[in-house]
């Protein structure tokens, strides 16, 4: 009788302890789910560029390449060592500046 009672008491203690402490797999899964939720919340937020209207639009990288192609119809062949990438990325370039720098014959 005493051993049955001891066995029952130890089983009850182990059961209650395991209910209070999540297993390692559960805590990892919960952590991963929280990280995924945080990432999706960050993705759904609007970027600053879309939240705040900008006064001027600057062309850098791919945007500059597309701007040159739409203005000249061909890749840029710079005149007199003009660095249009630096100029257009720091200030707003006009189509006339792009034509003068890249394709003056057009």
From Swiss-Prot:
Signal peptide (UniProt feature, chain positions): 1-19
Principal place of residence: secreted
Protein's name in the database: Probable insulin-like peptide beta-type 1
SUPFAM superfamilies assigned: Insulin-like
GO molecular function: hormone activity
Coiled-coil segments: none
PROSITE patterns: INSULIN
Keywords of this entry: Cleavage on pair of basic residues, Disulfide bond, Hormone, Secreted, Signal
InterPro entries tied to this protein: Insulin-like_regulatory (IPR052335), Insulin-like_sf (IPR036438), Insulin_CS (IPR022353), Nem_insulin-like_b-type (IPR003235)
Any single biological process term in GO: negative regulation of dauer entry
Subcellular location per the Swiss-Prot or TrEMBL entry: Secreted
Disulfide bonds listed in the record: 60-89, 72-102, 76-103, 88-93
Tissue occurrence: Expressed by ASI and ASJ sensory neurons and weakly by ventral cord motor neurons.
Domain of life: Eukaryota
Function noted in UniProt: Probable insulin-like peptide which negatively regulates synapse development at the neuromuscular junctions. Probably acts as a daf-2/InsR agonist ligand to prevent dauer formation under optimal environmental conditions.
Gene source species: Caenorhabditis elegans
Family: Belongs to the insulin family.
Residue span(s) of the pro-peptide: 20-51
Membrane-spanning intervals of the chain: none
One Gene Ontology CC term in the entry: extracellular region
């Amino acid at each position: 009788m005493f051993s049955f009672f001891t066995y029952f008491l130890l089983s009850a203690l182990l059961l209650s302890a395991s209910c209070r402490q999540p297993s390692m797999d559960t805590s990892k899964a919960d952590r991963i789910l929280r990280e995924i939720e945080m990432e999706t919340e960050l993705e759904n937020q609007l970027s600053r560029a879309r939240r705040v209207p900008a006064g001027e639009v600057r062309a850098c990288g791919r945007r500059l390449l597309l701007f040159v192609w739409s203005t000249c119809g061909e890749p840029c062949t710079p005149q007199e060592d003009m660095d249009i990438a630096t100029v257009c990325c720091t200030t707003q370039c006009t189509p006339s500046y792009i034509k003068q720098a890249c394709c003056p014959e057009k």
